[in-house]
UniProtKB/Swiss-Prot annotation:
Domain C2 positions: 212-326
Region (Disordered): 197-218
Organism: Arabidopsis thaliana
Chain positions recorded as Ca(2+) binding sites: D298, S301, D304
PROSITE patterns found in the cross-reference section: ARFGAP (PS50115), C2 (PS50004)
Protein name: Probable ADP-ribosylation factor GTPase-activating protein AGD11
């Protein structure tokens, strides 16, 4: 990638992409924005293109703390980040930062195109840290989680380091000429509106959850949390779920672990939905239960509650730590969560070591609702992945 603008052909941009390009190229920048065509190779594998993007100089280090070899991406912000910073990004909520793994998640060409369109860590930091004069306060690889949380929230959620005039740069959006242009990074007002909508969504279901489980922890505690691993949750399917519309429901699932929450897509008109959708969460210490909530999506009113359950992930995490470096090749049972009248299990949740992975299949009877069963699969991953 060129470090200057000499002998660089003009880049034709349009739509929301134009705003970001104008911002990044203004006032004689010291770098040239990446172009989608620069990363298009004869290979059609998105992962190959992603690996090539990761080798760009600015992307070799975490955008927030500078740790080398970041293995995580905030797709919605366009930055490569380390495992420690990824936990804070997840706590921001997917309406601000949607975190994916370079290695563990399946990538599409559209997602890589979107990432390329942001310009990489250098380009994004030029914008989000435009007024971050005191670089000494930026986290280092060995900074505490409290320091990371404070900086990352100020940077992406509160926009404290952005140029004040940045929000006025994109009052006009050029018409898009293609359907693959990445979302604009230029509209602070749009981002703020999106944040308010996201907060309203989280608060709406959070209040309903508090009716059953008590108040949530404040965000001020998020930075004091240490992360001990990752939990990969495959929401498989629901069976005989409750009716919340005339004769059916439009269900979706929310997973919450500490300050983090993620949700599946909505499946319309189905009491036996099959999601088969994989979601990822960081595991905090101390380790809270994994909360599972099911809702019916409504267009003109508050989403209806369809049941909930809690999962103790401590046995799975303990088993994963014990066998993290195991060379055992044959499938092996490591433990089980026994179904009883005291818990919500339909059948025993067996913890298995298979192909070097520690997994647990769980069938849950939803609580505080008239009926419904949810099947999920858990996998515990070490922080090194």
């Amino acid at each position: 990638m060129s470090l200057g603008q000499e002998n660089v052909d003009p880049v034709e941009v349009s739509g929301s992409h134009a705003c970001l390009y104008e911002l990044l190229c203004s006032e004689t920048p010291k770098w040239t924005p990446l172009r989608v065509e620069d990363l298009q190779t004869s290979s059609s594998d998105p992962r190959d293109r992603l690996e090539k993007l990761l080798k760009q100089p600015g992307n070799k280090y975490c955008a927030d703390c500078g740790s080398p070899e970041p293995k995580w991406v905030s797709l919605s912000l366009g930055v490569f980040i380390c495992i420690k910073c990824s936990g804070v990004h997840r706590s921001l909520g997917v309406h601000i930062s949607k975190v994916l793994s370079v290695k563990l998640d399946e990538w599409t060409d559209d997602q890589v195109d979107m990432l390329v369109g942001y310009g990489g860590n250098t380009a994004v930091n030029e914008r989000f840290e435009a007024c971050n004069i005191d670089q000494s306060k930026k986290p280092k690889p060995d900074s505490t989680n409290e320091e990371r949380n404070d900086f990352i929230r100020k940077k992406y959620e509160q926009h404290q380091f952005m140029d004040p005039k940045d929000g006025a740069l994109c009052t006009y959006q050029q018409p898009s000429r293609t359907n693959t242009s990445p979302p604009s990074l230029c509209s602070a007002s749009h981002r703020s509106t999106k944040n308010r909508i996201g907060h309203a969504f989280r608060n709406s279901w959070g209040r309903r959850e508090s009716d059953h489980k008590g108040p949530k922890k404040s965000n001020s505690m998020a930075g004091m949390v240490e992360f001990v691993g990752l939990i990969k949750v495959n929401v498989v399917k629901g069976t005989n779920l409750a009716v919340r519309d005339v004769m059916t429901s439009d269900p979706y699932v929310i997973l919450a672990l500490g300050q983090q929450s993620v949700k599946t897509r909505v499946i319309k008109n189905n009491l036996n939905p099959v999601w088969n959708e994989t979601l990822m969460l960081s595991i905090p210490e101390p380790m809270p239960p994994l909360k599972v909530l099911v809702y019916d999506k409504d267009t003109f009113s508050t989403d209806d509650f369809m049941g909930e359950a809690e999962i103790d992930i401590q046995p799975l995490v303990s088993a994963a730590k014990a066998y993290e470096t195991s060379s055992i090749k044959e499938p092996m049972q490591l433990g089980s969560w026994v179904a009883s009248k005291e818990n919500t299990l339909v059948s025993d949740g067996i913890i298995l070591l298979e192909d070097g992975k520690v997994k647990q299949d769980i069938s849950l009877r939803l609580q505080n609702v008239e009926r419904g069963v949810l099947e999920i699969q858990l996998e515990c991953l070490p922080l090194t992945q």
